[in-house]
A protein has these predicted regions:
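AlphaC helix of the eukaryotic protein kinase fold
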Residues: 42-64
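Protein kinase catalytic-loop region centered on the HRD/HxD motif
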Residues: 118-130
């Protein structure tokens, strides 16, 4: 792929990484001179209806959204040889997972500022009828200027579709952030994303995920049955107000969680202003 030009415009420069479905390349937009990321469906899936549909679904979901805290879709296309690609913003930086692995628990005020931006992105997605379904630190990017961007809407679904989590599209890394409804393959809605945001917030505040286990099934069962240890018991710097936000987001039953990303966003901001008030 190196040096190949897609659509007469996007010149592939180097590899950025790969997943089970697609490879991601750094490319230069010959029209503007700027660098972009190009996500290319693997060649072996060009004629696979399931993977083509999933790739198209990502494009459909991404096309609904334009937000400073989302990795935005710039272009989409199919080459004459069947090569399918998405052109997205190139983010020069690290994933949130890398930050946590390098630093351990983040300062609560920094973690809160990051989660505020994640929630702004999630709120925008939900307002546009998109449920992400795979919120995790690996899908949250932080660029060199400190801008937070949510990426990878590859398993997102339009909210009015029959949205279940029974697809075998997830990876082991996702199960640590699964909502209980995802863990049992039930229908999911916007509140499932909020649970996952809560799990990410938990990890930022404590340096560890809410639940661990030797197998994905063992971890999933804990999401379903075991209450999480309050973050403040692991990191005493976590305020009562932030404890409340995280544990409210991690309620087992969707009806007991925040009603919306906006509600959770409000409480995170209040927790920063009044850390000892619940």
């Amino acid at each position: 792929m190196i040096d190949r030009v897609l659509a007469g415009r996007y010149k592939i420069v180097s590899s950025l990484g790969e997943g089970g479905m697609a490879r991601v390349w750094r490319a230069q937009d010959l029209n503007t001179g700027k660098y972009v990321a190009v996500k290319v469906l693997r060649e072996e899936y060009h004629d696979d209806e399931v993977f083509v549909h999933r790739f198209e679904r990502e494009a459909q979901a991404a096309s609904r959204m334009t937000h400073p805290n989302i990795v935005n879709l710039l272009d989409v296309g199919v080459e004459p040889d069947g090569t399918r690609y998405l052109v997205i913003e190139f983010v020069s930086g690290k994933t949130l997972k890398q930050f946590i692995q390098e630093s351990g628990a983040l300062r609560p005020d920094i973690a809160a500022q990051i989660i505020i931006r994640v929630l702004a992105a999630v709120q925008h997605a939900h307002q546009n009828g998109v449920i992400h379904r795979d919120i995790k630190p690996q899908n949250i990017l932080i660029d060199k200027e400190g801008t937070v961007k949510v990426s990878d809407f590859g398993i997102a679904r339009v909210a009015n579709a029959q949205t279940t989590s029974q697809d075998t599209e997830t990876v082991m890394g996702s199960v640590y952030y699964f909502s209980p409804e995802q863990a049992k393959g039930a229908t999911v809605d916007e509140k499932s994303d909020l649970y996952s945001v809560g799990a990410v917030f938990y990890e930022m505040l404590t340096g560890q995920v809410p639940f661990t286990g030797e197998t994905p099934v063992a971890i999933a069962m804990k999401h379903l049955q075991q209450p999480p240890v309050p973050p403040s018991r692991i990191n005493p710097a976590v305020s009562p107000a932030l404890d409340y936000v995280v544990l409210h987001a991690l309620e087992k039953k969707p009806r007991n969680r925040y009603a919306s990303a906006a509600d959770m966003l409000r409480d995170v901001r209040l927790a920063l202003e009044h850390p000892d008030t619940i």
